[in-house]
Regions:
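Catalytic core segments in nucleotide and nucleic-acid processing enzymes
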Residues: 44-177
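Interdomain/boundary linker segments immediately adjacent to catalytic/signaling cores
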Residues: 1-40
Length: 177
C-alpha cells in the first residue's frame, strides 16, 4: 500500500492522542497541587526552581518540595548528616472521569507501596473526581494515609483544605502564612 497513512497507523493515532491528552490532564493536576503546597509553605521558601521549592523550617533545617516521577510530589527534610528524611509522598490523580477512578486509585496504591518501602512517613492521594467514595478508596488503597479532593483543596474555606494545610505545616515545620 503506497499511501502515507496505512490502516494500522491510523488505528494507533487515536490512542496516542488520547494518551497525550491524559498526560496533559495529569500534569495539570500535579501543577495545581504543587501550587497549593507552594502557597501553604511560602513563608519558608528560600529558593525556587521549576518544580522545586527549597525551604527552611522552624528547626532551621532544609526541606525540599519537588515534582517527581514517583511519587508525583515529594516532601523531604534534609538532616544535618545530609540524609533525607522522607516526609510526604503525594500522588495526584488529575483525571476527571468517574469511570476510571478505581484504576487511578490502584496506580496510587502501587506508588505508595514503593514510597512506604522508601521510608515516607505519610502517603497522600489527591483525586479530581468529586463523586469518589473515599471510604471505598481507602479499602482499595490501604497504603494511602489521607485522601483529598482537588476541588476541596481549591476551596480555601473547606475542611479538606484546612486539614491539608495543617498537616503540611506540621510535617514540614513551616509556619502558617
Amino acid at each position: 500500500m503506497p499511501s502515507i497513512c496505512r490502516p494500522r497507523t491510523l488505528l494507533t493515532i487515536g490512542p496516542q492522542w488520547r494518551g497525550s491528552a491524559n498526560v496533559d490532564i495529569g500534569t495539570e493536576g500535579i501543577d495545581i497541587a504543587f501550587g497549593i503546597v507552594r502557597e501553604i509553605v511560602k513563608l519558608g521558601i528560600v529558593a525556587e526552581a521549576s518544580g522545586r521549592l527549597d525551604l527552611k523550617n522552624a528547626a532551621n533545617r532544609p526541606v525540599l518540595v519537588e515534582i517527581a516521577a514517583d511519587p508525583d510530589i515529594k516532601i523531604q527534610e534534609v538532616m544535618t548528616s545530609g540524609a533525607l528524611r522522607q516526609l510526604i509522598a503525594i500522588e495526584v490523580k488529575g483525571g476527571r472521569d468517574f469511570s476510571n477512578i478505581h484504576n487511578r486509585i490502584g496506580e496510587a496504591e502501587k506508588s505508595h507501596q514503593k514510597a512506604c518501602a522508601a521510608g515516607y512517613t505519610e502517603c497522600w492521594t489527591i483525586v479530581n473526581v468529586d463523586r469518589t467514595d473515599l471510604h471505598q478508596a481507602r479499602r482499595e488503597s490501604p497504603s494511602t494515609d489521607r485522601f483529598y479532593r482537588l476541588s476541596d483543596l481549591l476551596d480555601r474555606a473547606s475542611e479538606g483544605y484546612r486539614d491539608f494545610q495543617d498537616r503540611i505545616q506540621a510535617l514540614t515545620g513551616i509556619a502558617a502564612s
